[in-house]
Curated annotation (Swiss-Prot):
Function description: Omega-conotoxins act at presynaptic membranes, they bind and block voltage-gated calcium channels (Cav).
Tissue: Expressed by the venom duct.
Similarity annotation: Belongs to the conotoxin M superfamily.
Xref: PROSITE patterns: OMEGA_CONOTOXIN
Ranges annotated as spanning the membrane: none
Localization, UniProt: Secreted
Bridged cysteine pairs (disulfide): 46-61, 53-65, 60-70
Keyword field contains Signal: yes
Pfam families, sorted: Conotoxin
Domain-level remarks: The presence of a 'disulfide through disulfide knot' structurally defines this protein as a knottin.
UniProt cross-references to InterPro entries, sorted A to Z: Conotoxin, Conotoxin_omega-typ_CS
Protein name as annotated: Omega-conotoxin-like CnVIIG
Sites bearing Cysteine amide, chain numbering: 70
Amino acid sequence: MKLTCVVIVAVLLLTACQLITADDSRGTQRHRALRSDTKLSMSTRCKGKGASCRRTSYDCCTGSCRSGKCG
């Protein structure tokens, strides 16, 4: 009986700790833009440096389109 109570209290304590840390870590991802650009270039075909591009299509591997050329 005592062991059962100890196990129940331990499980409740660990669950509470996980919920508290999950709320605290929301929105704290570092380098979010860098990570999404990396995923984009890995999942889609992208154009190399100097290729023609449009600013609205985001198809350059570098992520930047200046004056119609990937930079």
